[in-house]
């Protein structure tokens, strides 16, 4: 099982945490443009990072995350810069509720066109595509996510379901296991899971996952033969977490 990391804030301080990573890993780097992603990537010298994935983020006024409620100009900008490339890319498919809820009104007229635009990119991009997504409340929940344009059931993509135990304290072992089994059955080798959070994200108020809970959650993923777990985020890595990860690997 590959253990990888998201990094929403790829500052030198956060990237220095890579010194604790002694196993092959993958790094999902947030950046406002492909050019900035390439600049950050070029400055990282760590033989254990086997792959870098571009995680495009928008300005707050544009929606920050990718969804049909993001501004149309921002979506076109991100997709245009990736034309003709094969850079691995992760679309963080989340609604703008906590960053800019006004977009529900201002972008409603663009919703259908934006959804088609996102779908077209996902289906036609030449490189590897990952999508970070909410976990569904059953099959009906998955249909809701698809209707809202934050889930695209395209066979070629790799789907990362964000099962952040620290932010959803009601997640029981039984529920988590069902989500892992359901994802594996539906998406097979293209199913991934996101665990965390071990550091706050853009909201600044995310609860921190206890080390023992991380160990437990990772063990469940390993038992279900999930090919990759992505931890949010690298900047929260410390020696205690690193020791747990090394034992799991």
Language model region names:
Residues 1-249:
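Glycan-processing catalytic domains of CAZymes
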């Amino acid at each position: 099982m590959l253990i990888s990391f998201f990094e929403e804030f790829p500052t030198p301080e956060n990237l220095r945490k890579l010194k604790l990573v002694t196993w092959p890993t993958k790094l999902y780097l947030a950046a406002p443009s492909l050019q900035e992603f390439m600049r950050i990537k070029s400055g990282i010298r760590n033989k254990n990072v086997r792959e870098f994935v571009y995680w495009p983020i928008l300005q707050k006024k544009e929606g920050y995350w990718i969804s049909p409620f993001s501004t149309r100009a921002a979506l076109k900008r991100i997709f245009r810069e990736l034309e003709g490339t094969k850079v691995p890319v992760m679309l963080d498919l989340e609604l703008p509720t906590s960053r800019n809820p006004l977009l529900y009104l201002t972008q409603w007229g663009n919703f259908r066109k934006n959804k088609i635009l996102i779908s077209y990119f996902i289906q036609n991009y030449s490189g590897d595509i990952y999508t970070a997504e909410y976990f569904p409340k059953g099959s009906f929940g998955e249909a809701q996510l698809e209707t809202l344009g934050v889930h695209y059931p395209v066979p070629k993509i790799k789907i990362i379901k964000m099962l952040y135990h620290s932010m959803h304290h009601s997640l029981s072992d039984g529920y988590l296991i069902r989500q892992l089994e359901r994802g594996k059955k539906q998406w097979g080798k293209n199913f991934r899971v996101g665990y965390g959070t071990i550091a706050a994200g853009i909201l600044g108020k995310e609860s921190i996952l206890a080390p023992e809970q991380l160990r437990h959650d990772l063990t469940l993923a390993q038992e279900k033969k999930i090919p990759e777990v992505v931890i949010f985020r690298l900047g929260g890595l410390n020696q205690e977490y690193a020791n747990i990860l090394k034992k799991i690997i």
